Every structure is written in structure tokens, then in C-alpha cells.
Regions:
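Hydrophobic, glycine- and aromatic-enriched re-entrant/interface helices and adjoining loop segments
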Residues: 109, 113-115, 200-300, 327
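Transmembrane alpha-helix boundary/anchor motif
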Residues: 69, 77, 136, 210, ...
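Hydrophobic alpha-helical transmembrane segments
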Residues: 62-70, 297-314
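Membrane-helix boundary/helix-loop-helix interface segments in multi-pass membrane proteins
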Residues: 2-32, 36-37, 43-171, 348-363, ...
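Interfacial segments of multi-pass membrane proteins
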Residues: 141, 178, 183-197, 275-302, ...
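Hydrophobic alpha-helical transmembrane segments of multipass integral membrane proteins
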Residues: 35-42, 91-101, 181, 207-208, ...
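Hydrophobic alpha-helical segments of polytopic membrane proteins
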Residues: 65-69, 87-88, 94, 154-167, ...
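Loop-to-helix entry and N-terminal half of a specific, functionally important transmembrane alpha helix
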Residues: 319-358
Length: 391
């Protein structure tokens, strides 16, 4: 881990010498692995959205096009210029995450006020806030030069990183909030926070989760309405502990997800042959349960290929982090990698009953134009760290 908090450029002539001139602005292996995932995502989205009028493949494709353009622009931008804007990132986070509560533009959907509508344009600010959460976490931790042993400073950092989580929970959006926590966790780990502080934080959070789950019915009965947990959140936790619970709701969703994966066999049923989604048995097929559609069509073998691509991508990402010219660059890349790791484990894990059901999407695979654009912005930030390594 780097022991410096400021940029210490390497000789640009030496750096450029090891990069082919045609590709000096693009890390080809890294971007090819991401492109392979995007292509697989478009293939499965074409199938998943074909039979569902609520989703548009064209909109998903437009997200990819916009994302590619932004990725190219961001790759050319020197990420070092962002290192001193901690307060700005925090303010942007708060504004984005509270925007859905504003009258006229705020939109409620599926029990959460998470959307903003500006004329014909509708998007989730919480998705775009992932970018500023990454930059906020990286800029905060970079100030400590790779070592954070002072408890008071550690608590100060926790307080800053908790603000986006608190804001997103006012919507409420637990899934996105968990993603923010994963970003913060990887920033603390990669930034050299004392391991005793980290263990203590995990213990406190675990205790709070148990306390909330146990006390929720008491508070609900006293108040006459949901206080700590929404009904669907409690149901998902109970289904995770007992898959036979709520067989007509979240328990049904899990059962159909596992049927879809199991029915794919080793080589799958084939493209456009995912009957669980096409016949309407699998809920939210293009979004939460897109892995089930993919596994049903391409089988266990296809799932192994998908996981292998994720592993290759993450290995290349961590290599970029290891060779970054400064701690800020390392932290940006590690935060993004941590976010993707959490999303992959949670999304696939919930499909096979190993994790609670949430609305956390699968990187480059799940439906959502905003989601795709944000992932491409993340690719651009990582590529910028590689391009400007020593510049």
C-alpha cells in the first residue's frame, strides 16, 4: 500500500515507453474484459426484455452508447485534479440523494422515493451518487497517507462516509445503501485503517442489525405503522432464514429463481428459450434476477464463463490499483472494485439462496440505462488512473 497522500509523478517518458502509442489512452485487456461482459449483458437483456413490455432493450442500448462516450471522455481526464474536492463531493452527494424528496420532480415507485423526473428524462440520483461516493471515500482516506491509527480521526471518517448512507435511507433504498457501505468498507481497508477499528465497526453494525430485527415488531405495534423495517424488508430477511416463508411473495421469488437456474442444466436451454421469464414465472427478470435468465439460457457452463470474466476483470482492476502512481488513484480503483465485488456476490448469492433478496443489480448485466452509464463512468475512472499513471 502506498505511504503517500499526495501525487508523486513518475517520469512520463518512461511510462509512455511501455504503452503502445495506439493504445496509450486505453488499457486494452481491461476494457476488452469489460466489453465481453457488456456484450453478454446485452444478449441476455434482449431475451429478458423481449417478452416484457415494461422494459425496453433500446433504452438499455442507449445507456451503453452514452456510457461509452462518457468513458472515453473520462479516460482522457486526469483524475489527479479531483483529489482536493472532498467537501464538494459530500455536498453533491447530499443534493443528489435528497433531490427525490423535492415536490414536482420527485417520483415514488415500488414503495421508495428514489426517482427524479425532469420532463421526459427519468433517473435515479442514487445510482449517479455512487460515483461521488467513490470519489468522496477515496479523497477522505487519501489524506491519511495509507495509515489511520487515530481513533478520533477514524470516527470522523466514519461520520463523513455515513452521510450518503443516511441520505439514501430517507428514500428508503436499502440495496443502494448497502452498496455505499461496501464502497466505504473497501476505502477503509485499502486506506490503511487500523484493523481493530474495522473489527469493532463490524461488530457494532452486526449488533445493530440484530437489534433492529428483534425490536422492529415492538416498535411497529407501539406506533401502529412500520418504524424500523418495511414489511417487504422483514419478509426478505425471514425468507433468507427460511425459504418456505411467504411462499406467495419473496419465498415464491426465490423458488422461481432457483428453478430457472436449475432448469438450465449444464449447457442451458438456448438463447431466447428461458421459459421461466418468458412465461412470467420469474419476477423482475431483467433486473434483480437477470442471472437466472442467463443461467437458464446458457446453463452451468455459461455461468462459469460469466464468473471467469468477472474474475479476470477484477484481477486487472486490482493490478491497476497496485500500480497507481498515488494513494488517491489506488483508492478510487479499490472502491470501485469493492462495489462490483459486493454487487456480484449479493446478486448471484440471492438467486441461489445464499444471500437475502435485495434490489442490488448485477454489474454490466442488469437492466437500467442509468446503471449502465454509471458502470461505464467507473470504467472511465479506472482507465484514467491507468492512463495518468505518473503523468
Amino acid at each position: 500500500m502506498h505511504e503517500i497522500s499526495s501525487v508523486q509523478p513518475r517520469d512520463p517518458d518512461v511510462v509512455d515507453a511501455v504503452k503502445p502509442k495506439r493504445f496509450k489512452y486505453f488499457n486494452v485487456p481491461f476494457l476488452l474484459s469489460a466489453a465481453a461482459l457488456v456484450i453478454l449483458g446485452l444478449v441476455v437483456q434482449y431475451s429478458a426484455t423481449y417478452f416484457d413490455a415494461d422494459y425496453s432493450f433500446t433504452r438499455q442500448l442507449s445507456g451503453v452508447v452514452v456510457g461509452v462516450i462518457l468513458m472515453i471522455v473520462i479516460s482522457r481526464f486526469d483524475y489527479h485534479a479531483l483529489s482536493g474536492f472532498t467537501l464538494a463531493f459530500l455536498i453533491i452527494n447530499v443534493v443528489l440523494l435528497l433531490a427525490p424528496h423535492l415536490p414536482v420532480i420527485g417520483v415514488e415507485a415500488k414503495g421508495a422515493t428514489s426517482w427524479v423526473a425532469l420532463g421526459p428524462i427519468r433517473f435515479q440520483p442514487g445510482e449517479f451518487a455512487k460515483i461521488t461516493v467513490v470519489l468522496l471515500a477515496a479523497s477522505v482516506m487519501a489524506r491519511y497517507g495509507g495509515r489511520l491509527d487515530d481513533l478520533r480521526e477514524y470516527l470522523k471518517v466514519l461520520g463523513i462516509l455515513a452521510i450518503p448512507f443516511i441520505c439514501i435511507m430517507t428514500q428508503p433504498d436499502m440495496g443502494t445503501g448497502m452498496v455505499y457501505l461496501s464502497i466505504a468498507a473497501f476505502a477503509l481497508i485499502a486506506g490503511g485503517a487500523n484493523w481493530r477499528f474495522l473489527v469493532g465497526t463490524i461488530a457494532v453494525i452486526a449488533g445493530l442489525v440484530v437489534a433492529i430485527f428483534m425490536l422492529d415488531p415492538v416498535f411497529d405495534s407501539l406506533a401502529g405503522h412500520d418504524v424500523l423495517l418495511k414489511d417487504y424488508q422483514r419478509s426478505r430477511l425471514l425468507v433468507f432464514m427460511d425459504s418456505t416463508y411467504d411462499v406467495s411473495g419473496d419465498g415464491y421469488n426465490l423458488r422461481q429463481a432457483m428453478i430457472a437456474i436449475g432448469s438450465g442444466g449444464f449447457f442451458g436451454k438456448g438463447f431466447m428459450q428461458a421459459t421461466q421469464s418468458s412465461l412470467g414465472f420469474l419476477p423482475e427478470a431483467p433486473t434483480d434476477f437477470v442471472f437466472c435468465v442467463y443461467a437458464e439460457e446458457f446453463g452451468f457452463f455459461g455461468a462459469l464463463i460469466l464468473l471467469a470474466l468477472y474474475i479476470v476483470l477484477l484481477a486487472l482492476v486490482f493490478n491497476i490499483a497496485r500500480n497507481a502512481s498515488d494513494l488517491f488513484g489506488t483508492l478510487i480503483v479499490c472502491c470501485i472494485a469493492g462495489m462490483w465485488i459486493f454487487q456480484i456476490l449479493e446478486n448471484i448469492g440471492m438467486d441461489i439462496g445464499l444471500m437475502p433478496i435485495t434490489g442490488i443489480p448485477l454489474p454490466f448485466m442488469s437492466y437500467g440505462s442509468s446503471f449502465m452509464v454509471v458502470n461505464f463512468v467507473m470504467l472511465g475512472l479506472i482507465n484514467s488512473v491507468w492512463v495518468h499513471n505518473g503523468r
